[in-house]
From Swiss-Prot:
Binds 1 zinc ion per subunit. It comes from Escherichia coli (strain K12). InterPro entries: Amidohydro-rel, Guanine_deaminase, Metal-dep_hydrolase_composite, Metal_Hydrolase, Metallo-dep_hydrolases. This is Guanine deaminase. It catalyses: guanine + H2O + H(+) = xanthine + NH4(+). Its EC number is 3.5.4.3. The lineage of its organism: Bacteria, Pseudomonadati, Pseudomonadota, Gammaproteobacteria, Enterobacterales. CDD domains: GDEase. One of its GO terms (cellular component) is cytosol.
């Protein structure tokens, strides 16, 4: 495993970050920090010093070459709080809503990950896609096959990437070729936790796909894992689609709704992340808030599968932590800028105006907070892990034109969010090292 070199590194350019986590969007502007000519000093993969170039340049030894990115914009690495790596090859599958889509497209694709060599090949592709889109941390679904998770963690470990992932637990209501059992899912997950959790920057998430595909016996095994390894994460889906919710209620009639299934099995709380949450009942909003659970907002996926519109305003009101998720492969892009672009539209339809600052927060420090990692990543505070992206605000002729006609910082950020894509990502750094550069 590689880690950041011991020698000092110096990066110069324009920087933007949010210096503290917040409880309502009105606070973001006061927490935002923009340094037009800044200096980032990195040592052993961590932020050693950050501030104005003039205040820090005397700290740079003569032997150190400064990486000069003036004219670009340097931001903390993007955080993707919900994505399926074994669905990369089926992005853009036509014409279905959630339950039909799973059976027709997802399950046959995930079957291929039984082959370790195939899983390794796709893990390498997946991580390259994350990096070329500026994503440096992700919460990731594997498949039911433990080797799918081994392959992903192996690939992430080569660049010492901050990643949380887990093996899908699924013992019913899916094709026989993809089912495990309550017992086997427990033992396989336990082995993966022992092998990978807190190995370098890797972390493990207990990952029941969603309540309909886990029997009560398997949910009890997920609970047992969480009790035995309380510092692991939990990653699953919740209230994405109305038919799904009705199905859960029919399968678990003794529970008080969908979220209550997870709650009664001890799968709510800090570091428990629920993707989608488009159709929550009031009591479910309250429970997510009370338990300090988190939501992954996945706009491109919710639009693509016709699932519905996520209510971000309500999440702020209820003080529920939210991060952004691309949700590849129901989501249609690895790119966080495009994901924020779609989030803006989802919220416009509800009369809520997502500012560029708020969007930027959700994709960086807010996402880190939703994953319980805000003490490690998300901004440029000294001691934080040095994951960051050098962005090109004028990557296309249209972006150049629009940038030239933008006056304020918030306007320039908003233009990047609406017109930007993978061409906007000039360089990506993980653990203080360059891991992607645009040709």
């Amino acid at each position: 495993m590689m880690s950041g070199e011991h020698t000092l590194k110096a990066v110069r350019g324009s920087f933007i970050d949010v210096t503290r986590t917040i409880d309502n969007p009105e606070e973001i502007a006061s927490a935002l920090r923009f340094i037009e000519d800044g200096l980032l000093l990195i040592k052993q993969g961590k932020v050693e010093w950050f501030g104005e170039w003039e205040n820090g340049k005397h700290q740079i030894p003569d032997t150190i070459r400064v990486r000069d990115y003036r004219g670009k914009l340097i931001v903390p690495g993007f955080v993707d709080t919900h994505i399926h790596y074994p669905q990369s090859e089926m992005v853009g599958a036509y014409g279905e809503q959630l339950l039909e889509w799973l059976n027709k497209h997802t399950f046959p694709t995930e079957r291929r990950y039984e082959d370790l060599e195939y899983a390794r090949e796709m893990s390498a592709f997946f991580i390259k896609q994350l990096l070329r889109n500026g994503t440096t941390t992700a919460l990731v679904f594997g498949t039911v096959h433990p080797q799918s998770v081994d392959a992903l963690f192996e690939a992430a470990s080569h660049i010492n990437m901050r990643m949380i992932a887990g093996k899908v637990m699924m013992d019913r209501n899916a094709p026989d070729y993809l089912l495990d059992t309550a017992e086997s899912s427990y033992h396989q997950s336990k082995e993966l936790i022992e092998r990978w959790h807190k190995n370098g920057r890797l972390l493990y998430a207990i990952t029941p796909r969603f309540a309909p595909t886990s029997s009560p016996e398997q949910m009890a095994m997920a609970q047992r894992l969480k009790e035995e390894y309380p510092d692991t994460w939990v990653h699953t889906h919740l209230c994405e689609n109305k038919d799904e919710i009705a199905w859960v209620k029919s399968l678990y009639p003794d529970h008080d709704g969908y979220l209550d299934v997870y709650h009664q099995y001890g799968l709510t709380g800090k570091n428990c992340v629920f993707a989608h949450c488009v159709h929550l009942e009031e009591k479910e909003w309250d429970r997510l808030s009370e338990t300090k659970s988190s939501i992954a907002f996945c706009p491109t996926s919710n639009l693509y599968l016709g699932s519905g519109l996520f209510n971000l305003k309500k999440a702020w009101q209820k003080k529920v932590k939210v991060g952004m998720g691309t949700d590849i492969g129901a989501g249609t892009t690895f790119n966080m800028l495009q994901t924020l672009n779609e989030a803006y539209k989802v919220l416009q339809l509800q009369g809520y105006r997502l500012s560029a600052y708020e969007a930027f927060y959700l994709a960086t420090l807010g996402g880190a907070k939703s994953l319980g990692l805000d003490d490690l990543i998300g901004n440029f505070l000294p001691g934080k892990e040095a994951d960051f992206v050098v962005m090109e605000p004028t990557a296309t002729p249209l972006q150049q034109l629009r940038y030239d006609n933008s006056v304020s910082l918030v306007d320039k950020l908003f233009v990047m969010m609406t017109l930007g894509d993978d061409r906007s990502i000039y360089r990506t750094y993980v653990d203080g090292r360059l891991v992607y550069e645009r040709n």
